[in-house]
Design a protein with these regions (language model features):
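Short intrinsically disordered terminal tails
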Residues: 1, 58-59
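N-terminal acidic leader/helix
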Residues: 1-32
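Intrinsically disordered, low-complexity Pro/Gly/Ser/Thr-rich segments with frequent PxxP/GP/PP motifs
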Residues: 24-50
């Protein structure tokens, strides 16, 4: 499964909250994020302490 992440409100300060949206290439609406998916997002958005996933879209 391939996904890409749109990052909103990126802030590298300690304790910053990062909002991300995950889309498939067709922009289809997805389901609520699962723990393993959020861990993948955290790896993509490295260097951030907190991540808020607004939407998850998967193919």
């Amino acid at each position: 499964m391939s996904i890409w992440v749109k990052i909103k409100n990126m802030d590298n300060r300690d304790g910053a909250v990062v909002s991300v949206k995950v889309f498939d290439t067709q922009g289809q609406q997805g389901e609520t994020v699962e723990l393993n998916t959020q861990e993948e997002v955290e790896k993509l958005v490295h260097g951030s302490n907190k991540i808020v996933v607004e939407e998850v879209r998967q193919p």
